[in-house]
Amino acid sequence: MALRWGIVSVGLISSDFTAVLQTLPRSEHQVVAVAARDLSRAKEFAQKHDIPKAYGSYEELAKDPSVEVAYIGTQHPQHKAAVMLCLAAGKAVLCEKPTGVNAAEVREMVAEARSRALFLMEAIWTRFFPASEALRSVLAQGTLGDLRVARAEFGKNLIHVPRAVDRAQAGGALLDIGIYCVQFTSMVFGGQKPEKISVVGRRHETGVDDTVTVLLQYPGEVHGSFTCSITVQLSNTASVSGTKGMVQLLNPCWCPTELVVKGEHKEFPLPPVPKDCNFDNGAGMSYEAKHVWECLRKGMKESPVIPLSESELLADILEEVRKAIGVTFPQDKR
């Protein structure tokens, strides 16, 4: 039975996700509605992607009984309102990362989803790439021996992107791209809470975080570290080292297709790329869409791959890190 999607917001990421959904079997995925705060933009998006219904408000989409699951592709500060609206209307929700600007927002959304017994998942698409799944298998099999260190880097010059440096839009490196690094170390060490977090970094002149390096001490004398930046290019790789070897996700580690296990190179080709994809390896969004279908058809209320408790943990870590370098957002005071 097809999962009936409603798309909330008509930005670039929503366009990619919609295009990818339409490469999947119609027996499993159908996009039935789209909403924007401007009806003309919603209609334009609907025409481009052949979507039957277009709405000029998110409220109208939330009330549409034909929508089973909402995909939230708004900018960070609008995530909470859109998620809460859709949950209140009884919809399952897949929300782009980060689910919330701060930990309080994430906890409020999680509590709402649980109280209503509705599915909610943070769209950390990285976890569902076959290369990431293969890495988890390597770790589970003990191929690397006793784990010691996990390391990730993600840096691009994004200064030309207005929202990346806009404090009002919760810009900066941590929430936009650093979350990919944090989720990596968390995945490696089983979603454990770090015992200690050490941070060095610099702020951009607009008040957002510019470049940040973080050391996370986990139970068992193992540690993770990462650097993220919106002003410099980094290696954009991730690795795990143990007493018997190392495994690496090659660039781009946030949407990986190549894995090196103890020197052995493995490739995981993407499915066919939809036309007009805006982001690197956008076809890989199909993996998380398939996972949502599986979860909902099994009656699950959250994903076992990125459970809500881990979304809360990631939000806690990101908030602690940015506050350590003096970065706050307007949403923190609400």
Curated annotation (Swiss-Prot):
For the site labelled May play an important role in catalytic activity, the residues are 180
Regarding tissue, the record states:
Small intestine.
- Look up the domain of life of the source: Eukaryota
Q: In this UniProt entry, which residues are annotated as the site May play an important role in coenzyme binding?
A: 71, 79, 97
Sorted alphabetically, the Gene Ontology BP terms of this entry are: D-xylose catabolic process
Q: Hey, which family's this protein in? A: Belongs to the Gfo/Idh/MocA family.
Q: What is this protein called?
A: Trans-1,2-dihydrobenzene-1,2-diol dehydrogenase
